[in-house]
């Protein structure tokens, strides 16, 4: 078959397949043009999932009648210009668009009408393109002083085969909504409105430039919960700036759909950035949970290539390691600064669950019959009414409140705290001299309050200044042990304790081989072992932090970790996985009764330890209930 030159209409339709994949893609290109035109307000309408009709109106600089026919020519744009040497540099791009493909591509597969009034002009003009056929420029009505109105009807009518690959109208409408949300998050100083089939879906007024305006826009798009649980990010390294907001580890999702990344104001989906985000949270979330974030990378245009994807959805960095390191470092710095803070949604979900209960004591029946109605208070005083005899109530769980803390400990509390640390597997660590160590704990003095009770030998109940805190003792102590092990590992190695009698652990031969192959790494974590014949290892030393631990169970869990992740993870990540497993074994277990000093020692350590708001698997270590919320439960508010 001989080589042929394709006609312009076919070329444009091929280009449209790359640039205009679906209605949301067309809207993205039109919104990009509006932003480049300096618009402060952008209105978007879509009907029939965007296939029937799309309208994008803006108050930008507009187009003159001479520019209208040029705007729909392929590779014609106002966003690139030659430098002093006559060179067209594609690395110095400061606009959203630059290819000059969007309008001709859309016009080749749909009915496209552009109406515009240039800034300072008296008259408005329009041009119509149908399936690649260009009409004449003609005078037109235009509602605003300047700007453009671009209407797209019957998208893909000229390429019926493409229509077969479209999803349902609902799915296309959701994609359009998501696209406008991304554009709105990238441009907080621009007002956006979106109507789907005549129904207002979004209405976002312009916000002031800066972190507060950006956070207000993110709250309007992602919800107030994100605003309440977001950490501000603002770090710069070697000319690259990372700003934005990232959610607390306990404010996570089941997928990565709530991760928004922007490079020089451009929404992108970049694997490097997403991988960096995962790495930053790897220490705080389970593998099936994902963080929430809206991150903005700003750098010189010469350091990033945006001309690597037809729809400009991907970018390529000149120094990807620098960008990845900045993201990981900045996020971990912010997470460390959050201390023991946990997501507010944890308490909200708990309260919602309580409110949903129809009966607070299912299956419980009162064990007495009320007496006759009294004649009144005066009759009671005169002996005319005797209150009924009430038998003790047998409420489910009432007798399982396993420990109660008295308001005052008396004596040398510092000594009691030392014993608490020993009992809580902090034997080799001198206790912290907390303020007021020789006086009763006052809930006003501490963020996590003063312990009042232990429930079901699992949960610590503490009174705070304006509410109460419920702590999962195992999850909290697991994070404390983990953080200390990481600190010791970073400073030269985890302190070991020698077993009086070395313990032989039987394993599968393949498991034993994997564990022995990592013996040097494990020794750095305080676990010293060696081969003891086929399918067995001999444990000589264990981490001192773990106290008295089940060495066999620990080694078997480590063998499972290495089997699952040993080849896939880097050395540092492997060590952290093993650290996490060890910390789980060395933690205060659920079902263990703690005394008052032990509980308060755990609370004080949580307050002093970064990341203590969640365990190693991303679950919350405590739930805080404000007094106002408790009063609402009882109808006092």
Swiss-Prot record:
InterPro entries, A to Z: DNA_mismatch_repair_CS (IPR014762), DNA_mismatch_repair_MutL (IPR020667), DNA_mismatch_S5_2-like (IPR013507), HATPase_C_sf (IPR036890), MutL/Mlh/PMS (IPR002099), MutL/Mlh/Pms-like (IPR038973), MutL_C (IPR014790), MutL_C_dimsub (IPR042120)
Alphabetized UniProt keyword annotations: DNA damage, DNA repair
Listed transmembrane segments: none
Keyword Cell membrane in annotation: no
GO MF annotations in UniProt: ATP binding; ATP hydrolysis activity; ATP-dependent DNA damage sensor activity; mismatched DNA binding
One Pfam family in the UniProt entry: MutL_C
SMART domains xref list: DNA_mis_repair (SM01340), MutL_C (SM00853)
GO-annotated cellular components: mismatch repair complex
Example GO BP: mismatch repair
Family: Belongs to the DNA mismatch repair MutL/HexB family.
UniProt function note: This protein is involved in the repair of mismatches in DNA. It is required for dam-dependent methyl-directed DNA mismatch repair. May act as a 'molecular matchmaker', a protein that promotes the formation of a stable complex between two or more DNA-binding proteins in an ATP-dependent manner without itself being part of a final effector complex.
The protein's name: DNA mismatch repair protein MutL
Organism expressing this protein natively: Caulobacter vibrioides (strain NA1000 / CB15N) (Caulobacter crescentus)
Organism ancestry: Bacteria, Pseudomonadati, Pseudomonadota, Alphaproteobacteria, Caulobacterales
Gene: mutL
């Amino acid at each position: 078959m001989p080589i042929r030159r394709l006609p312009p209409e076919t070329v444009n339709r091929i280009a449209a397949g790359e640039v205009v994949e679906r209605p949301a893609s067309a809207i993205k290109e039109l919104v990009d043009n509006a932003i480049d035109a300096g618009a402060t307000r952008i209105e978007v309408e879509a009907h029939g999932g965007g296939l029937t009709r799309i309208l994008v109106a803006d108050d930008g600089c507009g187009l003159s009648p001479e520019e209208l026919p040029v705007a729909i020519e392929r590779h014609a744009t106002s966003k690139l210009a030659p430098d002093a040497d006559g060179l067209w540099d594609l690395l110095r791009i400061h606009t959203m668009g630059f290819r000059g493909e969007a309008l001709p591509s859309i016009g080749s597969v749909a009915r496209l009408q552009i109406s515009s009034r240039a800034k300072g002009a008296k008259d408005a003009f329009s041009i119509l393109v149908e399936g690649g056929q260009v009409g004449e420029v003609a005078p037109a009505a235009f509602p605003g002083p300047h700007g453009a109105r671009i209407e797209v009807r019957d998208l893909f009518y000229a390429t019926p085969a493409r229509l077969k690959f479209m999803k349902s109208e609902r799915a296309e409408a959701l994609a359009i909504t998501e696209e406008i949300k991304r554009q709105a998050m990238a441009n907080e100083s621009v007002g956006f409105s979106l109507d789907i089939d005549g129904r207002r879906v979004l209405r976002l007024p312009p916000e002031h430039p800066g972190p507060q305006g950006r956070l207000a826009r993110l709250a309007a798009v992602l919800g107030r919960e994100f605003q309440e649980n977001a950490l501000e990010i603002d770090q710069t390294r070697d000319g690259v700036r990372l700003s934005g907001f990232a959610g607390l580890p306990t404010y996570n999702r089941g997928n990565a759909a709530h991760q928004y990344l922007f490079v020089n104001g451009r929404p992108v989906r970049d694997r490097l950035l997403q991988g960096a985000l995962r790495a930053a949270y790897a220490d705080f979330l389970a593998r099936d949970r994902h963080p929430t974030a809206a991150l903005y990378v700003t750098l010189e245009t010469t350091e990033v290539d945006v001309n690597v994807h037809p729809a400009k959805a991907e970018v390529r960095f000149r120094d990807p390691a620098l960008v990845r390191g900045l993201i990981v470092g900045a996020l971990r710095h912010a997470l460390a600064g959050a201390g023991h803070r946990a997501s507010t949604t944890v308490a909200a979900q708990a309260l919602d669950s309580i409110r949903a209960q129809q009966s607070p004591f299912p299956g419980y029946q009162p064990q007495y019959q009320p007496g006759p109605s009294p004649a009144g208070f005066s009759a009671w005083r005169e002996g005319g009414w005797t209150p009924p005899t009430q038998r003790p109530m047998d409420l489910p769980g009432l007798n399982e409140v396993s420990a109660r803390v008295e308001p005052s400990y008396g004596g040398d509390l510092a000594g009691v705290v030392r014993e608490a640390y020993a009992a809580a597997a902090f034997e080799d660590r001198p206790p912290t001299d907390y303020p007021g160590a020789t006086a009763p704990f006052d809930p006003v003095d501490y963020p996590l309050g003063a312990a009042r009770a232990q429930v079901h030998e699992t949960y610590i109940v503490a009174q705070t200044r304006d509410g109460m805190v419920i702590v999962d003792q195992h999850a909290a102590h697991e994070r404390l042990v983990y953080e200390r092990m990481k600190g010791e590992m970073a400073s030269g190695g985890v302190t070991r304790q020698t077993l009086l009698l070395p313990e032989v652990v039987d394993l599968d031969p393949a498991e034993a081989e994997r564990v022995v192959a990592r013996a040097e790494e494990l020794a750095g974590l305080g676990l010293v072992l060696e081969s003891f014949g086929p399918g067995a290892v001999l444990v000589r030393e264990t981490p001192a932090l773990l106290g008295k631990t089940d060495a066999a169970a620990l080694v078997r869990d480590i063998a499972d970790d290495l089997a699952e992740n040993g080849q896939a993870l880097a050395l540092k990540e492997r060590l952290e996985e093993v650290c996490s497993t060890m910390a789980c074994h060395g933690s205060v277990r659920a079902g263990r009764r703690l005394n008052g000093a032990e509980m308060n020692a755990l609370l004080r350590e949580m307050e002093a330890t970064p990341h203590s708001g969640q365990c190693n698997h991303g679950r919350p270590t405590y739930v805080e209930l404000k007094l106002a919320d408790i009063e609402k439960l009882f109808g006092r508010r």
